[in-house]
Amino acid sequence: MKRLLTAMMLFGLALVAGVQAADLQVGDMAPDFSLKASDGHMYKLSDFKGKRAVVLAWYPKAFTSGCTIECKSLAEKGDLIKKFDVAYFMVSVDTVEQAKAFGEAHNADFPLLSDPDKKTADAYGTLRDYGGSIGVVSQRWTFYIGKDGRIAAIDKAVKPATSAEDVAARLAELKIPAK
């Protein structure tokens, strides 16, 4: 009985620890990352700390319908976001080659970050198993990170068609300064 109780307690602690690691909240420090982008550069969140706010628009998979709509929104109406002193990226668990081809196909003038080992997606808690040919990819969530490196907002109900407008509205709401 004692062993069973101990095992149950350890299992419960493991579950709680797993949830806490993936359950980021507004006000938490954003997990640092170093990811290669579609433009060939490596980007580290820590390079922006104290300098600029950062937007990470996580998306499931390049060349799928919702992701294509979101990328087109950000590419075609990115001027709305560029008014703010912010670095913005789309991020997925696709390879950098897939991210580059996807960005080029939709005239994205912003970097698309690649997280093929899924470590950063796991740190942000965005991974989900969609099954079938999609498999384990990121959910469509957008993280707004302040200059202080803390999460200022999380959007878990992203609307791909109005992504650029919604990001710009949230940046204004968060009082991110203009350039």
Predicted regions and their residues:
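Short, acidic, Ser/Thr-enriched surface-loop or helix-capping motifs
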Residues: 24, 37-38, 115, 145-146
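Structural microenvironment flanking redox-active thiols in thiol-disulfide oxidoreductases
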Residues: 63, 68-109, 116-120
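Sec/Tat signal peptide C-region and signal peptidase I cleavage site
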Residues: 16-23
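Positively charged n-region of N-terminal signal peptides that target proteins for export
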Residues: 1-4
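A short beta-strand-turn-helix
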Residues: 34-53
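Bacterial N-terminal signal peptides
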Residues: 7-16
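Short active-site neighborhood of thiol/selenol oxidoreductases, capturing the structured segment around
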Residues: 47-68
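Thiol-/selenol-based redox modules, centered on thioredoxin-like
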Residues: 137-179
